[in-house]
């Protein structure tokens, strides 16, 4: 009976199968990439032994004081000093081409002895011989650096060539969001380089007992140990590594859950329509002795079989999808070893089983609800027609008969269109959400979520002992450059802030004129007076500070009270920054960063190239390029998701339209036959069906667009809230969002309506009379 029923209703059964299969594919794929990401990142971190805490420092320091501190604190399990030789990008070449266009800061390092190892592509500790170099995987992918290529370091009359012998994975600095990259060379080579160019920077790296990071930060600051740089926790490193892949996992899982919900709605609709159509048959079965329980099992079996087959195929397809989307994860982090394959195959099975349980329980509830009628009611074939309502025909006749009848029937039978309406909302939402996310990330104004106002160029001055002199030289040039509309110079340094526990933490501060490139603040405004400070969203949250409250800073052994003037969004430096008018001592500065706006007619790329030739000690980056390099991986991922969601959404719209039309035509065959008997042609009836579906679709697209533009912003903000941006304003491409996407959705549905509605030709009044 089940097999015959599936054969009889091939299209409807196939559509339900497709819904369940697609949701199983996405659920399985999302779980698989999630497992792959977590296990690969954890495996890389374990083999590399990333530090629990890192304190960066430039300049001389007291080695004995550091050693004594380590000896006197039992929670420190291991300690080492990693020396990094910072090299200007203009002094670094790949196959003759300078790195000066790269946003990344580059440092040469030798392999560490105790922990924080740089690994090769087999996730083994990389060994580099003299004259060779290990290049980060980031440069392999972004700049096309390959094994055997030449990397040249050149300054003045000094030059040295290295052969790329290894592509390395750096558990600390793999992510594009980490703006520094380490290049691995031999110990002898780094000593030679240091005597000719570059500047040393030190990383004080700690392995700690669990839960000791807060104690270390407090004790380290209290001991007044070297801290001319940022402090980074291992958890922040892990968060940066998981950010880009975490977004795609969240999106895939969300789509999968929504698809299961839509499949459940379709299932409900199909079961109710089937039971209504076979009401008299069910009545006969009950009359001859079948119990409700037996009938329920019989009808439930069909949908369980469909769900099982869809789940198996979806599981296999989802694993292929997961492996495809996991390629970049494996490339950057490697494959985890051990029993990971069992976990990667096992956890998606649990997801598919959950889907099967949802379908089974849903079938039981829906069928039970529809078997409440008495045997007499079922034998009579009584249905819910009386609940559909009615509409009046116009007294003076039809002006547009097809439109009048279509909207009249839509008014009476709106309940049967709820499922397709929800699917159209979902499809529109699904198309627009990733598209709007990608547009927002790629737009120059996304800079505001990185803690600075929108600008054309970013200029960095760092890695030099005469930082102030370089800044003055840059300022003199900018003042005399007729192409520049405005610029602002910002100091970046660190101070200490009093936290809620009465202890001192490090805080990174930007000091400069905030009015030149203003931000949109979540709350309050930019600091104007010398006693005002603005906090990033995560800093305000962690310090539990609101607008108007006091905050105590300690700089150069002086405690100063500030008033919180504003709270802004920032996803850089782990989302923990601040802005204040604090004059840093030159030796305490990390960098000067200058933001520049050019006059409208000036070509940004051309001007950037010109400034690089003049300002040889500075790093000049167009803001679009800055965003592309920092968030390029995320943007590429969103591009893949955007294409996939368009295809899935159109497929869903076509499937659900086909299914609903088939069910409506079967249910309304009497009405169709009567209309044809009184003079309506097949084309008239097809037009009436098309008007109903397209009216529902246009309304659904409108609602979906509103939700994507509003609720979608909240979703994106929720994704980024852990990184420092809680409230995102979508930057929408109106042509794509409001013309192209709705147009292609309407066209796809129009085509399927045209094809499926041809079935009205088989309904005739003579057949209804015979029946």
Please place each PLM-identified region on the residue numbering.
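Hydrophobic alpha-helical transmembrane segments of multi-pass inner-membrane transport and secretion
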Residues: 8-37, 243-283, 301-318, 349-357, ...
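Membrane transport/envelope proteins' first extracytoplasmic loop
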Residues: 1-264, 273, 444-458, 549, ...
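Juxtamembrane segments of multi-pass membrane proteins
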Residues: 55, 401-530, 534-538, 549, ...
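Short helix-loop junctions at transmembrane helix boundaries
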Residues: 312-350, 698-767
